[in-house]
Amino acid sequence: MADHAFHRPGPLKQANKAHKTGRHRSKGAIDNAQKGKIGLRPISHKHKQQQRKEQRRNQMNQLRKNKREEVLEQKRKLGGQNTAPFLVCLLPMHEQIDPMSALEILKSCDSELVVENSPSGIVYINLPRFKQRFAFVTPPVGRGNELIALDYLKVCDTTLLLTTAAFGDDEIFDRWGQRIFNMMSAQGIPTPVVALMDLESINPKRRPAAKQAAQKVISKLLPEEKIMQLDTASEALNVMRRIGGQKKRILHNVANRPHLFGDVVEFKPGSDPSDDLGTLEVTGFLRGQSLNVNGLVHIPGLGDFQLSQVVAPPDPYKLDKSRDGENSEVRLLDRSDPSKRTSLQSENIPDPMDAEQTWPTEDEIAASQAETKKMKLVKRVPKGYSEYQAAWIPDVEEVEDPDGKDDDDMSEDDDDDKEDDNEDFMSCDNKSFEDEYEKRDSDTEEFQDTVSVASEAAINDEKYDQQMDFQEERETLKKLQQARTDQLWPDEIDTPLDVPARERFQKYRGLESFRTSPWDAKENLPADYARIYQFQNFDRTKRRILNEAKEFEGVLPGLYVTLYVINVPESRWNAFKSAQLMDNIIVYGMLPHEHQMCVMNVVLQRMPDSEVPLKSKEQLIIQCGYRRFVVNPIYSQHTNGDKHKFERYFRPYETVCATFYAPIQFPPAPVLAFKVNPDSTLALVARGRLLSCNPDRIVLKRVVLSGHPMRINRKSASIRYMFFYKEDVEYFKPVKLRTKCGRLGHIKESLGTHGHMKCYFDGQLRSYDTAFMYLYKRVFPKWTYEECLVRTAEHERQHASANRRSSQQVAMEE
């Protein structure tokens, strides 16, 4: 093989200088990064343990088994031999449907079925075929009974919605059905089952089309529900099987607390006849969580009470009657300790010597007025500014107050704050409104024209006018006009001519930035804040209390028990019995702190069919969780941040946050807002949820002062009509200005003595532009909480005196 010659470089080979990229990456490194190449990495000695295929399969089977056992455990807690029966609410969606006829069909579904009726009207059905038992309740139907139906639905396990095919495809739900369905949707529907009745009464050829039309209507409201037929015994058996076998929907607001639907109720007066107190014995099946006998219970319509003991009588509705000999005696489950009972005190009693923020005395006011007359070096700071907020305001020369008046003596409330508070209590019972509106109708009839009318059309017009409330029409029109004005020019008000602006807006202040400027949540608090309770961390407390309620070992749910509710006023109980349409009562076990007053914040959304704007501080009936009460809430924007802008009106299709004083309640809790109609019925105007119980939520009311450019010279302009006194211009000089076109500026100096001022902006002003000054003050709700309880004569006298004290306090504040 021939030898091959290879080139060998000599010592004089050219060596090019290496390219140095410096601090930036080279083109090659950038190219490698874009291609996704990864550099070399040291091998870690900690290898992750990779599961084999069999191990992964076993893990999935274990998780599936745990979930299945959890579901079965939830099912075993209801309807069995030693558990509470399925509580089913029969709710017609049409006023013409008789729920008792549907109940008779259900009673005939099986030959071995056992039916028993309780003294309060609950129908117990034991079905040995399924080894299950059921309890059926039927709330009253018709306009005015919505609240009773909502109370029943709060504690039921299943809702059996009854519809009919006898009135055609368009009458699956009538007006009553639509109204109650909207309310129960806002509150939360327990596991729904829809049954179609009277399908056998129509032509057999039209039955499939009628059922399909009904299914189409139901699918829009309840997409996951399939309509069932309820006309025969076999169909009733299918409905019972569906109720007992379907997965139950959990309403956490009720599931987090113990509750009892009263089966037998008995009131026993106390030993002292002059005391007017007695013991209320409520018997029924305990549901939800374990009951703490040392805690408080709430009965809607009666109030909050303490328990003395809990006993377990024999269960009269057992599935297997052959075991009646077992546990035939009354057993004492738990007895409360008087030293450990939760106190019924709902308000904090402030100590006047504990440095609480209270109204100053006359001596303090006189001393303050004498001090302000002295010559001193001051800063002109809007009232309410703290030291760190006023640090950027420049010092001014010495001034002397010629009048010697304190700014606090002047009223600062806007025109919309000078409205008269409605001192009349509006109860949730429709009968309480009849006297007021009958009197109004009688007054209206006195002014009716008594001249005989010949034509029939004129007679109809006269009848129509007699049924109309002209005062309510005028008030609604005025409210609509004010809401429209506030929507077009939000928060804009005219500077008064006769009162200096520095006195009119003495409690307002300017903010550098609404989002970032600080505002102390503890300054200038009202006296009512000394009466409430506050948590250091509400969310943390909520989690702790809910976890403790689940782990508490008290009276276990599912037992047939008797609660001894002590210190119930006999007069209130008699009034409650006379006002109730049904013999059932509901008892809720309250969590710790849920009877103490606080500032409650709820998120509300207007209902689609409610179009009249709601004014802030207008009276509403609020149902929050298991409570129902009357308050005058204030509204604010539902936004992130530590400050929230006050809303004068709650307009249709909007979402706001309502703030008011109410007892503490831990979320989740649905919220329903009702307004009283002129015919004394209730209309659902908003729905929402409980946000928090936090008094530190800062709600700022904004006023906008507007001025118009008189002369414009590039970035400077002369503004007029914002103020009418030279002193006002100097007082508000530190506050920034904003224009409608987005310019920012500030006041340079005053021009003349009539409020004209020279201002500088960050750009050229347009002749059609308008200068604005934003001022803010913190607003608080008024203490108008009134729980919806039955009223006795003594309570009416106490309420009247409380209203007089409240009106005197409001007059002093204004």
UniProtKB/Swiss-Prot annotation:
Residues 1-67, 316-357, 392-448 are annotated as: Disordered. Residues 16-27 have a biased composition (Basic residues). Required during maturation of the 40S ribosomal subunit in the nucleolus. Keywords: Nucleus, Phosphoprotein, Ribosome biogenesis. Disulfide bonds: none annotated. The gene is Tsr1. Residues 84-249 form the Bms1-type G domain. This is Pre-rRNA-processing protein TSR1 homolog. It comes from the Eukaryota. The modification Phosphothreonine is found at residue 444. GO terms for molecular function: GTP binding; GTPase activity; U3 snoRNA binding. Residues 395-426 have a biased composition (Acidic residues). PROSITE patterns: G_BMS1. GO terms for cellular component: nucleolus. Belongs to the TRAFAC class translation factor GTPase superfamily. Bms1-like GTPase family. TSR1 subfamily. Residues 317-340, 431-442 have a biased composition (Basic and acidic residues). It comes from Drosophila melanogaster.
